[in-house]
Design a protein with these regions (language model features):
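Glycine-rich, small/polar surface segments that engage phosphate groups of diverse ligands
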Residues: 38-110
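A charged, well-structured terminal subsegment
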Residues: 108, 170-194
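Generic N-terminal amphipathic, Lys/Arg-enriched alpha-helix
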Residues: 1-24
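A short, well-structured juxtamembrane/interface segment
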Residues: 22-42
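Short, glycine/polar-rich helix-capping loops at beta-to-alpha or helix-loop-helix junctions
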Residues: 145-157
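Short glycine/serine/threonine-rich phosphate/pyrophosphate-binding segments
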Residues: 54-59, 124-131, 153
Length: 194
């Protein structure tokens, strides 16, 4: 037996993750699934964004939705991970302010009927809030996967997907769980996207 006690710690983390995953509200996730299927079918755009680990998750999932699905189906969602382009991010942060790095991209790219998904542990990041506000003015349907109390984003998103967990890493894990769940569901329903 190791003196570090890692196995016990690891098991406790997995247990906390399992409890949190069972708290995912499936009704709003289903709304997102249906919105993404419609987005795919109608060739509209899908925007994903977040900060830090949430930004990494947005980029990861954009790859899954773009390549992971199209590799097998021959077509995929028109997905944009807004944190992915460091030149655009640093330009906007420098010239417009960090709180506008996502909203400005949406103002330029988004069209009515597009779909946006915010990832935020706290739900209070100013750049996420400005982006959700921009979605309202652009006619973009917004969803937000949120942890902790849900923050201000819970009221700003058209459809919040909130799990009240006070652990940032588990909150970020749930973003990927939901994202991968959606990817597999979209793949299973690919015939409806033609």
């Amino acid at each position: 037996m190791s003196q570090s006690g890692f196995a016990q710690f690891g098991r406790a983390y997995i247990d906390r993750l399992e409890v949190a995953a069972r708290q995912i509200p499936l009704a709003p996730v289903e709304q997102l699934a249906e919105a993404l299927l419609g987005c795919w079918r109608e060739r509209r755009q899908f925007f994903i964004f977040g900060n830090g680990g949430s930004a990494g998750n947005a980029i990861h999932l954009a790859n899954d939705y773009l390549y992971g699905i199209s590799r097998v189906t021959g077509h995929a969602l028109r997905v944009h991970a807004l944190p992915a382009n460091s030149a655009v991010l640093t330009c906007l942060a420098n010239d417009e302010g960090y709180e506008h790095i996502f909203a400005h991209q949406l103002a330029v790219l988004a069209q009515p009927g597009d779909v946006a998904l915010a990832f935020s542990g706290s739900g209070n990041s100013p750049n996420v809030l400005r982006a959700l506000e921009c979605c309202k003015t652009r006619g973009v349907r917004s969803f937000a996967v949120l942890g902790y109390s849900g923050g201000k984003a819970k009221a700003l998103a058209d459809v919040p997907i909130h799990v009240a967990i006070d652990d940032m890493q588990i909150s970020e894990d749930l973003q990927l769980v939901i994202g991968h769940m959606l990817m597999q569901w979209l793949y299973e329903h690919r015939d409806q996207a033609r």
